[in-house]
Amino acid sequence: MAEDLILERCDLQLEVNGRDHRTADLCRERLVLRRGQPFWLTLHFEGRGYEAGVDTLTFNAVTGPDPSEEAGTMARFSLSSAVEGGTWSASAVDQQDSTVSLLLSTPADAPIGLYRLSLEASTGYQGSSFVLGHFILLYNPRCPADAVYMDSDQERQEYVLTQQGFIYQGSAKFINGIPWNFGQFEDGILDICLMLLDTNPKFLKNAGQDCSRRSRPVYVGRVVSAMVNCNDDQGVLQGRWDNNYSDGVSPMSWIGSVDILRRWKDYGCQRVKYGQCWVFAAVACTVLRCLGIPTRVVTNFNSAHDQNSNLLIEYFRNESGEIEGNKSEMIWNFHCWVESWMTRPDLEPGYEGWQALDPTPQEKSEGTYCCGPVPVRAIKEGHLNVKYDAPFVFAEVNADVVNWIRQKDGSLRKSINHLVVGLKISTKSVGRDEREDITHTYKYPEGSEEEREAFVRANHLNKLATKEEAQEETGVAMRIRVGQNMTMGSDFDIFAYITNGTAESHECQLLLCARIVSYNGVLGPVCSTNDLLNLTLDPFSENSIPLHILYEKYGDYLTESNLIKVRGLLIEPAANSYVLAERDIYLENPEIKIRVLGEPKQNRKLIAEVSLKNPLPVPLLGCIFTVEGAGLTKDQKSVEVPDPVEAGEQAKVRVDLLPTEVGLHKLVVNFECDKLKAVKGYRNVIIGPA
């Protein structure tokens, strides 16, 4: 009788499997695999080798605290002649003496997570068990049978493997891309993402069921959407919008997700202070990409927060055009969420592809502060009965704005604007540092028959109010125009551009006002206004009325959003009519310049020289540069400028870098001081092999 088969050791083939599964950055010390794709193991036995027909090798793969075959969290499979796609299987490919090379496969719908792999080796009636090791299983966008399959290699590279990108802010008229370090493959991030799943209330309530459902990206996306905010659970980020961040970090100061996720872990899964929409979205993007789900951050400019799902944002204004009363429904200058790519087997066919998920805590969904996933196609078609949260997302990009302006006699005059909400919906382009406009994926062209049909469906299914017609045109129109030099620290002019398209004169009065505004629409102090101007608009005339805005009036009050709202109200008393025009102005920050000193080689020290010219008429105090970059820095680094920086002078520091990864990387920089906040910059750095 043959002696027992004794395993000496198991080689998990980290390098080969990491390369094949596109997990090399994660496979330095443990095995990380993508489901539905074969992987290699090498078994080294003591004494004699494996003999087919004499020895039986049986494998066990388990995940979660309560594994079961019925739940799909435990699999038992024996060595076969060839690996079988779509199931757990193993095959001996090569044998040299007492060493055997194995190819194993996993199902494309297996639950993701941490697995323990063990071996039962039996000879006759005797046998022994051995733990081969642990591996982490992720979603696989390269596997056609996986729910997250994406057929474009360029898109897979961008939406799963790329660790840096841009998030778009500012206003619809001036879009500003800020660099962000997602860092999904940085040290410890994968473990933190798995910890996040194991901290969610559904896992704590029924761990076995939760682990089983991790086979479905729809489920995991919804869990991540809830766990990135802390409103119902031990989530990652606490939101705050009141510009008081002294006991935490200002949302505008973050430059990457890595520091946030590491803080959450180091704090014992206690909330990190503070986040706003783009921070929530960026952290969700990091987690979902890390787990293997193709994901991108999306910005919607002029985004509606419609609480009662009537597709109307109503503003009640006084005679000067200032908003009064309840401000719970607002138009945000911009709002960010994420889109993830997946099939929707829980819905009828046709809803696969990009799904919107919003981790910013706004409204509850099925009792939890989360939103989505909802198919972007459902939003475009007005299919508001499709899971999850379609009415809320539809309103964000399609609501109408109704202005009620109080007249001198106390009556209210109404106007509707159909064209304000859901503009310039933006994301980073694939493979390029440029913005891609994806508005067409959410909305049909304004005024098209397809748009009308989508609104008919939305109004019918959600029992929404019928759209009302805009007030009758008077032939007088007004727009807010901007001048040149719209930069932080400058004095500048804006203009009320008024046209009379009729053959008659119009006697009008004009009010112009500029106020500080936060990105979520909350108004601050007035920084410029004019007295009531009496105007005579000649037939077919054009008029341009300036309003001067001084740094000394806005500098101490501007929020980190760098936004000023200009409002013009043109009143024609004789016709009892008015024209309201508003525009949000973004003040551009100074440029951060980055020079890389030294030869950019792997594991060779580099120096980054980072500088910024003071654009203000006053000195800058407490200047500090913070830098980070996946593959360039192990941790975030901050360097202070010891002396005040006078007007027109340079703030300059040098930062040591030690690149660990070959290829293209982004060094992301944030600058802060007493007068300038959240100034961002970046530099692409190509690292060559040592």
From Swiss-Prot:
GO MF term set: calcium ion binding; GTP binding; histone dopaminyltransferase activity; histone serotonyltransferase activity; peptidase activity; peptide dopaminyltransferase activity; peptide histaminyltransferase activity; peptide noradrenalinyltransferase activity
PROSITE patterns in the record: TRANSGLUTAMINASES (PS00547)
Broad class of the protein's primary localization: cytoplasm
Catalytic activity annotation: L-glutaminyl-[protein] + L-lysyl-[protein] = [protein]-L-lysyl-N(6)-5-L-glutamyl-[protein] + NH4(+); L-glutaminyl-[protein] + serotonin = 5-serotonyl-L-glutamyl-[protein] + NH4(+); L-glutaminyl-[protein] + dopamine = 5-dopaminyl-L-glutamyl-[protein] + NH4(+); L-glutaminyl-[protein] + histamine = 5-histaminyl-L-glutamyl-[protein] + NH4(+)
Regulation: Acyltransferase activity is regulated by the binding of GTP and Ca(2+): inactivated by GTP, which stabilizes its closed structure, thereby obstructing the accessibility of substrates to the active sites. In contrast, Ca(2+) acts as a cofactor by inducing conformational change to the active open form. In absence of Ca(2+), Mg(2+) may bind Ca(2+)-binding sites, promoting GTP-binding and subsequent inhibition of the acyltransferase activity. Extracellularly reduced and activated by CLIC3.
Residues where N-acetylalanine is found: A2
Record's comment on post-translational modification: Disulfide bond formation inactivates the calcium-dependent acyltransferase activity. Cys-370 can form disulfide bonds with both Cys-230 and Cys-371: formation of a disulfide bond between Cys-230 and Cys-370 facilitates formation of the disulfide between Cys-370 and Cys-371, which promotes inactivation of the acyltransferase activity. May also form interchain disulfids between Cys-230 and Cys-370. Ca(2+) protects against disulfide bond formation and inactivation.
Cellular localization per UniProt: Cytoplasm, Cytosol; Nucleus; Chromosome; Secreted, Extracellular space, Extracellular matrix
InterPro entries associated with the record: Ig-like_fold, Ig_E-set, Papain-like_cys_pep_sf, Transglutaminase, Transglutaminase-like, Transglutaminase-like_sf, Transglutaminase_animal, Transglutaminase_AS
Organism superkingdom: Eukaryota
Matching SMART domains: TGc (SM00460)
Residues engaged in binding GTP: R479, I480, R481, V482, G483, Q484, N485, M486, R583, D584, I585, Y586
Biological processes annotated in GO: cellular response to dopamine; cellular response to serotonin; peptide cross-linking; phospholipase C-activating G protein-coupled receptor signaling pathway; positive regulation of apoptotic process; positive regulation of GTPase activity; positive regulation of small GTPase mediated signal transduction; protein deamination
S-S bonds: C230-C370, C370-C371
Cofactor(s) for this UniProt protein: Ca(2+)
Residues annotated for Ca(2+) binding in this entry: N398, D400, E436, E446, E451, E542
Modified residues (N6-acetyllysine): K467
Active site as annotated: C277, H335, D358
Function: Calcium-dependent acyltransferase that catalyzes the formation of covalent bonds between peptide-bound glutamine and various primary amines, such as gamma-amino group of peptide-bound lysine, or mono- and polyamines, thereby producing cross-linked or aminated proteins, respectively. Involved in many biological processes, such as bone development, angiogenesis, wound healing, cellular differentiation, chromatin modification and apoptosis.
PANTHER family, per database record: PROTEIN-GLUTAMINE GAMMA-GLUTAMYLTRANSFERASE, PROTEIN-GLUTAMINE GAMMA-GLUTAMYLTRANSFERASE 2
Protein name (Swiss-Prot/TrEMBL): Protein-glutamine gamma-glutamyltransferase 2
Originating species: Cavia cutleri
Lineage: Eukaryota, Metazoa, Chordata, Craniata, Vertebrata
